[in-house]
Amino acid sequence: MYRRIIKPILFSLTIERAHHVALLLLRIIGLIPGGRWFLRKCYTVRHPALEREVFGVKFANPVGLAAGFDHNGEAYRELAALGFGFIEIGTVTPRPQAGNPRPRVFRLPKDRAIINRIGLSNRGLDKTICHLRRPHEGLIVGCNIGKNTVTPPENAAADYLRLFRNLYQYADYFTVNISCDNSCREGTTYTRTHILQILDPLFDFRRGQNQYRPIMLKVSPDMSDEVIDEISDILLETPLDGIVATNGPMAPDKIGRGRLSGAPLTQRAVEVVRRIHTRSGGNFPIIGVGGIMSPADAKAMLDAGADLLQLYTGYIYEGPGLVGEICRSLIADAEAAAAAKAAAEAKAREEIRAAAESEEAAKTAAATQTGIQAPETEKAAPGTETAATAQTQAAAPAESVPNPSPETQNSPARPADNEPDTRKKQPAS
């Protein structure tokens, strides 16, 4: 329905106007009794194989919506009803800011990409808090926070801390967005010292709270491999909970100023995720985002080491059905893996049983053969003699028999005492 009807209508509008229309329609559906239930019924896929527990938070599925779609937290409950496992709102800044002049967002349909130079447009901290106060039990909501454009880099830590403190009770996790906003031509180079100046006050504040809120750091694919390695090392040395990789890269000049998102980012985003995963030893959570346009892209990101996924441009081009497609693909992969594991275990058990039977048969055959050969060696066949027996008899000394005396030879044999004498008596002369 989205690809055949809704998408052509939305794509006939400018992307920013289409975005506002989509959010408005979602909010209207949310106001209708049973509206969010209907969306969940149509789009949500649930299965035990999809469930994840990452940085202490339980997710119904690993597919989330990236920051940048719902800047102010206006429709996060309706967006969650479209099947997302979690929603990340923002980027939120302490004070409202209008961003750059329009037009500032552009589609590249042939490349399935978007150029974005909005400039972190949002309605500020206070308005976001009003939206997050709405009941949202059971929903995982992350908050992407950043400094105001007019705030100098040396004062950035104060902006982040203000946002973190005031939103702490409303968000389930926080993403610290240190990327240069998309109004600039090149990404700002953040040193390790600068990053820690932003993060350390957040860690200090969190230590004094009763509830724990995970802190993620969002990185840009524009960063060199050396900088990405340094950020990965921060994971090992600080209480940072994980990395969101990646934001969009700055678009080439021939395309236009702004950040590029969509299919052209797929390969680089996977490379960054794999590098962070390898560098950190696979011991820290990674949210993979950037260029996920299909279930195959989602699988590649997870195989690279991502624990969770986020959609943005793929959601715009493919619609909410993409979430369900990815979830069903993950279920099929999990079931196939379980079946393969069961088959391998069954094969191993069969091999063990066959080996045991073969060994038992060999023992039985050996015992039977031994039992048959033993009597044959003890008793020779009638009428036959072994050579050894003949030699033994030949070597044995003959029994000495006394020579009979002449008298004994001439005298008749004497009957035994218990036998009658049957000899004839001779008459006396």
Where are these regions (language model features)?
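Glycine/Thr-rich beta-alpha phosphate-binding loop at enzyme active sites
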Residues: R36-V45, D181-H194, I228-G282
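Short beta-strand/loop segments at the ligand-binding rim of alpha/beta enzyme cores
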Residues: K58-G64, G138-C143, G208-M223, R279-G288
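Catalytic cores of alpha/beta
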Residues: E74-L79, M223-L235, I292-L309
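Glycine-rich phosphate-binding active-site loops on the catalytic face of alpha/beta enzymes
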Residues: E88-P94, I178-C180, V244-P249, A298-E325
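A gly/proline- and charged-residue-enriched helix-loop-helix capping module
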Residues: G90-L139
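C-terminal helical cap(s) of enzyme catalytic domains, especially alpha/beta-barrels
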Residues: G99-R112, P252-G262, Y315-A339
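Alpha-helix-loop-beta-strand connector modules within alpha/beta enzyme cores
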Residues: A113, R123-G138, T191-Y212, L260-F284, ...
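Active-site glycine- and acidic-residue-rich loops that bind
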Residues: N148-Y160, T188, L217-L236
